[in-house]
Every structure is written in structure tokens, then in C-alpha cells.
Amino acid sequence: MERFKLNTTLSYLVAVSGGPDSMFMLNELIKMNIKEIVVCHVNYNFREDSWKDQKLVEDFCLKNNLKLEKLIINQDYSKLKENFESWARNIRYDFFVEISKKYNIQNVLIAHNRNDLVETFLLQQDRKGYVKHYGLNKTSTYKEITIVRPMLNILKSEILKSLKEENIAFVIDSTNEDKKYKRNKIRANLSESTFNDFEETIKKLNKKLEIINLEVNWYVNNNMSADELKINKNLQDQDLEFIQRTIYKWLEVIKKDFVIQNRRNKTIFEIAKNIKVSEKVFWEINIGEYSIIKDYENLFIIETKAIQPKTILIKSKEDLYLSEEFINWLDLLNAIKRNKENYPYVITNDFLTYKLNTYTFGKKTNRYLIDKKIRYKNRMLKAVVYSTKTKKILNTIK
């Protein structure tokens, strides 16, 4: 009898650690005549005996003629500055994305069970942070892949019983007993007999979330321009939870939600709070390799390296090729030609500096930028060119 339902005409990547849950799932999958299975295993070398996990998975795949992709990590964990669980999850899921591209398989099976669902809910309650979905969702996305959890209706006790009956080997991760991890503390005090009550609470909370998310979806769908989110009074008048959900939804729509996955809740809270209370027309919040920027009534996300200030001195015609670093390079060249190539010139997108020491249409550039409400996005991405002699900006800022 099939323990869970899957479309057997599809191909799947299967995340297998060697623990009881993933070994149970893999053992059940090979009974189902699925089109294609590719096993994915990550050895973090976090424990001295982690090679045993890898060996177990290798032997099982060899015995059952299964494709296996491995990622072996060599990391000095004494130098790891971020939370291990979040770091490991990113490593693991990015590996799935890589293997997904290699085999052209979109779906990844994860062996979360019914116990994990309840434990996750209790962790969410304890942390009191942003919750996208209470408990665990049957499906979710990470970058280009779909995460599928087919075992959320199966108890841990059922899994262990099945493994024993079928004589399937598995390993126990010793860190699962370490009480310094909050999930392990919760697990130690949980009884499967209480799960029905917890699941009823989870259902009720998720129904409330559905109503809120309908409103969030409506706002995002009706207030987007290209990949930017419009900020208006309707959003600013909402509570911080609604604004946070709106940010998440917007990033999800433009496929940039991976930027904030596993980030501390205070990052999104800070963005939401700025939207609600800040009267500034411009602010920037850095999130790793990306920045989220408020630009008048617009919110956009961009790679931080794309908006780094650059300044180039053009001493002669031979230096003109340097202007190609900027997206509006042709505009810059035409401006220099109109000025009869009266070298030297400065080309820069460092608007915080040039706005104070240059002139545009007879007024200080800072005043011009304010009066014309020139978008900060354009100031950062597009360069200006001015003569070092007159300090007059030669191209049109728009």
C-alpha cells in the first residue's frame, strides 16, 4: 500500500540524509514505480561520524540502482559566524537547485513528517516572528524549484515501526539529542497523542491567514509597476504585520523571496517600520548582496554592486571608452561631443558628492534634483558628465 500520494509520471529529486525519515521515504518511493528518482545527499562533516550517514546512503543507492548526487562540505565551523541551521539549509537548497538544473527536474521531495509539522508550529509560537504558513506547507518554492513534503500525515512512530519491520538501516544524528537546540527541547516534551488538538489550532490560524493574504495579494497585484512596489497611504495605514506580508508577497512575485529566506525577522520588520513611519523620500536597507530601496513612492530591490558609486576622470579622447561602465554611456559621449571635447571631464554616478559641487541649468544640482524629483534609482544607475573647469553638468538628468 502506498504511504503517500505522488504523481508517478513525474521525476523527483529526493533529499536523503540517512536518517529514519528520509530513509523511510526513499524506501517507499522505490516501491511506487516513479518515472525517475535522483537522490541528493549533503555531508556537512559537522560530526566526526558523518561519513557513516554518507556511506549508508551510498550503499542503499548502489543496492537499489539509484542515481546519487553528493555534496561534501569542508568547513571550519569555528569560523562560521551565522546560525548553523540557516547556513546549512541554504547550502542544501542551493545544491538542490544546482542538481535540478543538471537533470531538468523541478520537484524536490523532503521527508518532513507529522511530528515535524507540530514541532515547527510550536517553534513559530515561541519565536513570535513573521509566519508565512503555520506548521509546514505541503508544497513551497525555493528559487526555481518546488519543495514537496509528502509525509506530513505520517507519524514518527509509524516511520520507526516500518523501518524495523522492513529491516531498513538508518543513522541517528546525535545533535538531535542536544538540548541547546530549541526544537530538540520541544520534541522531548511532545506526545503524539496531543497532535490532533495542535493540528486543529493550526488549521484555524491558517484560515485567518488566508483572509489576510487575500488582502495582501490584492494590494500587491494592484500596486506593482514592472518589478517595483508602489507605496501609498493605504499600505502605510495598515499594521506592521500586514506590511511585512506585503513585502514578502511582492518579493515572491518578482522571484526575489530567496533574498530574505532565513533572514532574521527584524530585517523585514525594519523595512515594514520604515514604510509605515519614515517620512524620508529615500532610504536603503542592505540585505547581503541586495539592497531594498525606497525611492519616492516606489520600493525596488537591486544587487548592491550595481549601485556602487564610481567616478572616472576623462583626460583625453583615448579615455572615452571608460564611459562604457555606465548604462547611459552613449548619452555621456554625445554630451562631451556637444561640448567640443574640452577635456578634462568627470563621469560619475556618485550623486551624494556631485550634487553638492556641480550646477545644472544655472542652479546647484542638489536643488535641481529636489525640484525635479529625479528618482534615486536613476541617480545611482545613470552617470553624469561635467567639465572640471565649469562644474556644469552637460547631460540631462532624468
From Swiss-Prot:
Top-level taxon: Bacteria
Entry keyword set: ATP-binding, Cytoplasm, Ligase, Nucleotide-binding, tRNA processing
CDD domains in the record: TilS_N (cd01992)
Catalyzed reactions per annotation: cytidine(34) in tRNA(Ile2) + L-lysine + ATP = lysidine(34) in tRNA(Ile2) + AMP + diphosphate + H(+)
Binding site for ATP: 17-22
EC code(s) of this entry: 6.3.4.19
Record's comment describing the protein's domains: The N-terminal region contains the highly conserved SGGXDS motif, predicted to be a P-loop motif involved in ATP binding.
HAMAP family: tRNA_Ile_lys_synt
GO MF terms, alphabetically ordered: ATP binding; tRNA(Ile)-lysidine synthase activity
Localization per Swiss-Prot or TrEMBL: Cytoplasm
SUPFAM superfamilies per the UniProt record, alphabetical: Adenine nucleotide alpha hydrolases-like
Functional description taken from the UniProt entry: Ligates lysine onto the cytidine present at position 34 of the AUA codon-specific tRNA(Ile) that contains the anticodon CAU, in an ATP-dependent manner. Cytidine is converted to lysidine, thus changing the amino acid specificity of the tRNA from methionine to isoleucine.
GO CC annotations, alphabetized: cytoplasm
InterPro entries: Rossmann-like_a/b/a_fold, TilS/TtcA_N, tRNA_Ile_lys_synt, tRNA_Ile_lys_synt_N
Gene Ontology biological process terms from the UniProt entry: tRNA modification
UniProt record similarity statement: Belongs to the tRNA(Ile)-lysidine synthase family.
Keyword Ribonucleoprotein: no
Name under which the protein is recorded: tRNA(Ile)-lysidine synthase
